[in-house]
Amino acid sequence: MKKLLKQSLLGFALVSMTGAAFADAQSVAELQRRLEQVSQYSADFDQTVRSSKGKQIQSGKGKFQVKRPNLFRMDTKSPQENLIVSDGANLWFYDPFVSQVTVNTVQDAVNNTPFVLLTSSDKSHWDQYDVTQNADTFVLKPKSKKSNLKQFDVRIDQSGMLKGFSTIERDGQSNLYVLRNITGGGVSSDLFKFSVPKGAELDDQRGGKKSKK
């Protein structure tokens, strides 16, 4: 009797795991389908940062630009300027306040920078996240326990119009980005080329080197 019960429980667990994996695969496929419907766009964004207790601690504005495949640019204008650029192979982060540039490969950065997924169809990128869907909201959770990120939410309708996205970090702090003034087409590939500004320190995490231009 105990053996039969154990086998039944094991079978139920396997079915549950298979069902969850199937649901996850469906959610990934649907999110990718929606993202692929719009190949390029430009939008303004409003950012709201909240503490783990839900208190607003900062707000900001900037511009978000995408060109598939694998190119995106997030240019934060306020309250403090910074720039994130994916050129398809590398992810660049520039902080003009401290005059520092950090660069990593897209492959290594995707675990902590899920924005990469908004322009990527690379299976190795998507395999780093569990994905679930609730209507027009998709919830992505990194599989790696080493990730600084707890959750990434994407709000996108069936026509492929991205409404916004949000991140929740391990410490509970959240960042909400709401897109507005969205326009499609006319996004120059030159926007996704990055050169280290003169005088800026370069932290090259692709090889662990630091240098100054």
Curated annotation (Swiss-Prot):
Identify one Pfam family in the record: LolA
Where is the protein found, in the record's own terms?
Periplasm
Signal peptide residue numbers: 1-23
Keywords annotated in UniProt: Chaperone, Periplasm, Protein transport, Signal, Transport
Which residues are in coiled coils?
A: none
What Gene Ontology cellular component terms go with this record?
outer membrane-bounded periplasmic space
Q: Which InterPro entries match?
A: LolA/LolB/LppX, OM_lipoprot_carrier_LolA-like, OM_lipoprot_carrier_LolA_Pbac
- Could you name the domain of life of the organism this protein comes from? Bacteria
- Tell me the subunit arrangement: Monomer.
Task: Indicate the family of this protein.
Answer: Belongs to the LolA family.
**Function statement:** Participates in the translocation of lipoproteins from the inner membrane to the outer membrane. Only forms a complex with a lipoprotein if the residue after the N-terminal Cys is not an aspartate (The Asp acts as a targeting signal to indicate that the lipoprotein should stay in the inner membrane).
Protein name, per record:
Outer-membrane lipoprotein carrier protein
* Species the sequence originates in: Actinobacillus pleuropneumoniae serotype 5b (strain L20)
**Per UniProt, what is the name of the gene that codes for the protein in this document?**
lolA
